[in-house]
Amino acid sequence: MTGASGVEGTRIPLHSLSCRPSAGRSAGSFVNTGIMEAFRGTRPGCLPVWFMRQAGRSLPEYRAVRGTNTLLEACLNPDLACEITLQPVRRYSVDAAILFSDIVVPLKLAGVGVDILPGTGPVLNNPIDTPDRVNTLLAKTADSIDFGIIAEITRHTVSVLNGIPLIGFAGAPYTLACYMVEGGPSKTHMKARAMMHGDKKTWQKVMMLAARLSGQFLAAQITSGAQAVQIFDSWAGSLSRKDYVDNVAPFSKMTIDLACGIDGNSDLSKTGKSLWPRVPVLHFAANAGHLLTAIRDIGVSVMSVDYTKPLDEASELLDDSMPLQGNIDPAMLFAPWEVLKRHVLDIVQRASRAPSHVLNLGHGVPPDASCDQLARIVDLAHSMV
């Protein structure tokens, strides 16, 4: 197994991982505060960086440790999920870990028959596309599903990160609903969008269910120590702005409210105040440059922008008032380093309009990406002061 040092079998102690010395910061100070400062709109001493899908399929140590476990088994095994979450932190010295999980884990915990097939993705035994099926699951979520295993994994992971922030993880209601209604991946999301317009009552129940599942999933992570959370809306780009605002945004806001303990079930939360300390909420939507202002309005803290939207244009749309994250084109990871470096520097320059910037990809790490290229990006980011 290769550690962050690149030496076979070596693991750098987590407490020693930090922004590079060129930033002039002590070992613990940036790790504990830098990326969190950026999430809250302040530029720290050097550029924070982490990668979507940094844990998992692209790392040889992941493939070694997962063994014969299925992806969902790995997500729900505290020791294994923790180890996989930590692997990219050790290897790259990124400034945050993100919980190793999958957006369909809440469905699994709700008793839904679901599996993640290699080369295909999440597949349900039966689509959740009828009022009866939706109502059955809504009744379960009304009483709250047991997310104890997620809380255990989160606490365990936080305890060994030694101050490095842990980012929680969940799918946005629309993307989760697409899997529920379609029964698996879809390029067009035709069944989901048809239900949205042709059977609004059932659609609203599906979205209510998805919002509850993802909101409770995030709440379990936040209350167990996650210092920030990111919501992934992989399929939002398939929607017009009107469809997003009218039929999706209210449920994404509901997810955020539930995650932050604003659920309408107590006198305190009815006032709009969180039942527990609010953490930064990051949001990523693919191919959704036309939705940025609508996404901002659901209450997100940091806009994670996909690689198709230049960050200076994104910042202008957001009145230069919102922290940005992104947005390296994953395809550039396969270019020569000097080409990739120019691309990264251009992104950083374009992001200078925003109050703060966290360097990331504009989509997930490809499974065959070069670990060396990702390590070079981290070194470059940490050299910027």
UniProtKB/Swiss-Prot annotation:
Keywords: Cytoplasm, Decarboxylase, Lyase, Porphyrin biosynthesis. Its main location: cytoplasm. GO terms for biological process: protoporphyrinogen IX biosynthetic process. Pfam families: URO-D. It catalyses: uroporphyrinogen III + 4 H(+) = coproporphyrinogen III + 4 CO2. PROSITE patterns: UROD_1, UROD_2. Catalyzes the decarboxylation of four acetate groups of uroporphyrinogen-III to yield coproporphyrinogen-III. One of its GO terms (molecular function) is uroporphyrinogen decarboxylase activity. SUPFAM superfamilies: UROD/MetE-like. The record marks 102 as: Transition state stabilizer. It is an enzyme of class 4 (lyase). Pathway: Porphyrin-containing compound metabolism; protoporphyrin-IX biosynthesis; coproporphyrinogen-III from 5-aminolevulinate: step 4/4. Substrate binds at residues 53-57, 102, 179, 234, 363. Belongs to the uroporphyrinogen decarboxylase family. This is Uroporphyrinogen decarboxylase. GO terms for cellular component: cytosol. It comes from Tropheryma whipplei (strain Twist) (Whipple's bacillus). The keyword Cytoplasm applies. It is found in: Cytoplasm. InterPro entries: UROD/MetE-like_sf, Uroporphyrinogen_deCO2ase_HemE, Uroporphyrinogen_deCOase. NCBIfam families: hemE (TIGR01464).
